[in-house]
From Swiss-Prot:
Species for this entry: Alkaliphilus metalliredigens (strain QYMF)
Subunit details: Part of the 30S ribosomal subunit. Contacts proteins S3 and S10.
Family: Belongs to the universal ribosomal protein uS14 family. Zinc-binding uS14 subfamily.
Gene Ontology, cellular component aspect: cytoplasm; small ribosomal subunit
Coiled coil: none
Protein name per the record: Small ribosomal subunit protein uS14
Gene name as annotated: rpsZ
Keywords: Metal-binding, Ribonucleoprotein, Ribosomal protein, RNA-binding, rRNA-binding, Zinc
Residues that, per the record, bind Zn(2+): 24, 27, 40, 43
Amino acid sequence: MAKKSLKIKQARTQKYSTREYSRCKICGRPHAYLRKFGVCRICFRELAYKGQIPGVRKASW
């Protein structure tokens, strides 16, 4: 889990656009962020298994 201070720091508008970075909307994790869904890989997996992300299912080939 991300520290509360880091979540607040990221939410503020930065002076320069290159300083902005994405965080997971659920847990606040900055790495392995999936832009299309707005969550990190761990939260994405949990939501997909619960069926809360429409159109996503486990792949098999």
